[in-house]
Amino acid sequence: MKRRTGGLRAVKGRGKRVENKEKTKRAILRAALELFAGKGFYRTTTKTISRKAGIAEGTLFNYFETKEDLALYFFEESLSEIIQWYEHDRRMKRAALPEKLFGIIEHLLDSLAPYEEFIGAVYLRSLAPASKLSPFSLQSQERHLRYLRFIRDILAEAEEEGEIPRLGDLGAHAFAAFQVGVITYWLQDSSRGKEQTLALLDRCLKLSTHFLKKGGWDW
Amino acid sequence: MNRNGKRGMLGRGFQLGKLGLSLVGSYLGYQAQNFLLGEGEQRKVRFHQQASRRVRDELGVLKGAVMKLGQLLSMQSKVLPEEALRELSDLQMRAPGMHATLARAQFKAALGKYPEDVFREFDSEPFAAASLGQVHRAITRSGERVAVKIQYPAIRSAIENDFTLLRSATLPGRLSGHLPTGLVDEFQKGFLEETDYVQEADNLDFFRKGLSGLTYLTIPRVYREFSTDRVLTMSHIEGEILGDFLKRKPSAAVRDLIGTRLAEMFDTQLHWLKKVHADHHPGNYLFRPDGRIGLVDFGCVKRSHFEISALMHCYLERTWQKSEAAERQFFRLIFGPKVPHKRARKVLPVLERLCDIVYPRDASANAVVDFRDPKLHELGSQYSWHILREKLIPPECGLIGRAQMGLHHILYELGARVNAKEVWRQVFAAGGIEERKSDALKSS
């Protein structure tokens, strides 16, 4: 009996520790994002981040070794946020496929909008093969896989409904590549409110769904 | 920017080409079927329906100016077969639009906030679609019912692309002189003006003030705090569009009353305000069973230098019959200062016959014009054809002509009988409007 309570307390304590750790991680990320939005990715130092987050610089390194780790954490968090938003949004449940996919990218862009400069910097960094942000790093691959599964499930639903023909895993890969293209376009879009990106996104998704529906692979 | 524009233009070119190809394809299919099976009237009707549905779908996807062209075509009652017309008239209100998520995103792109952060309630399903956007119902935080018009993203560059294509497509017509270059430019200017909702808000204010004497007319009020150049929030207006209104079978008296009021509105705008609501497609009018009228969509407004009172004087007095100088003056009024006199004279006989119907000379004659009169239509199309053949279209009259054509189309659909002469007499004599006119001019 006693042992059991002790065990429970231990689990509870560990739970609390994990929770606290997550809390600090989020506080650091919030501080960093604020600085990135104001000063830019390159000019923000770990020193200023730790000062803003109200922790010692040494503590910061316990959580994030480099600024790249911070960026990775940011992308993981925003992917989790999108999945959660998608699963709880009532409109997305009954929308047609082009609208669902539009909603996902639009939601992503909306959350990225304040950190445009930061995203641009991360894009450049990810081109370096040794970078943790490179699409071939294990961390990036893990996140990418989670994203592919998320999209794959949405496409599978549309396949079930007969909205599009069976695409297999290729559909999710194609959409991921498309999303990279859209973000690149978005970064360079100087129209007000980035409405050119909205138009591009809408037309591409409507047309591709239309063509897939019409002829599948045979057209 | 330029590069993107080019890509869009190629895309549109491809789609237009596809439209042409797919139409030709099914025409050929029809011919082959015809050859094998012999012609049946039933099949012909069905075929027309299919072809025009395809036209409508493709135009809907293209949006922008090409769709406007579709709308213009659909107003040419006698040019297209009845079935094609019915399909095309769907374009006027029910154009394929943005899904709720896109409309919401575009709202934010324009106003910086999502609609649910601005309004107490916002209906994500649009209740009306226009070629440049769509309209959603909403309720403001203070509880007022409003209509929110949201523009399709990047429609402006889409229109510019369409006109680049239109210019090359109309090159033969322009070279032969049947289509003045100025006309295409004027249409482009008109369409581009329609994309600026700030301009439209100014127009709404101008006409609300200028036409306030016409108590049967309602024009929406603008909520500037929720409007930009791409989103326009207006007070909600009750009423039904023409097609739905006619389904209720309104009495001839109500239809005549509405017809007379529409004519009065048109004459008042031309004569007193010197500005005309030039987009007379039926979706812009809302009718109520007691004869009240709501006028919405003020995107296309034409400032007019058209001297309607001088022209009406000519029509009523047949001045051109009095001397050659008077005849020249009359032609200048209709076709502009550089009118080729000889060619204009060829149009005169048809014009005189039209005039005898619309403005009968004999004071005792029944001056009521039945807009369903086939004779009127026959003369009307003869007149348009003559003008085209004699190359008499003055560029500055393009949009006024479009407005008048639209008005006549509505009067035809309505089956209204209007005493045009009397309407003009009353508008001209309405001294009370004088003050409103100066008010409106001041505010503009």
Region annotations inferred by a language model:
Chain A
Residues 31, 77, 108, 154, ...:
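Amphipathic alpha-helical segments in well-ordered regions
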Residues 74, 78, 82, 104, ...:
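Hydrophobic/aromatic residues within well-ordered alpha-helical segments
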Residues 132-160, 169-180, 209:
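Amphipathic alpha-helical packing segments from all-alpha helical-bundle domains
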Residues 86-93, 122-130, 158, 186-190:
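Secondary-structure edge/capping motif, primarily at the C-terminal ends of alpha-helices
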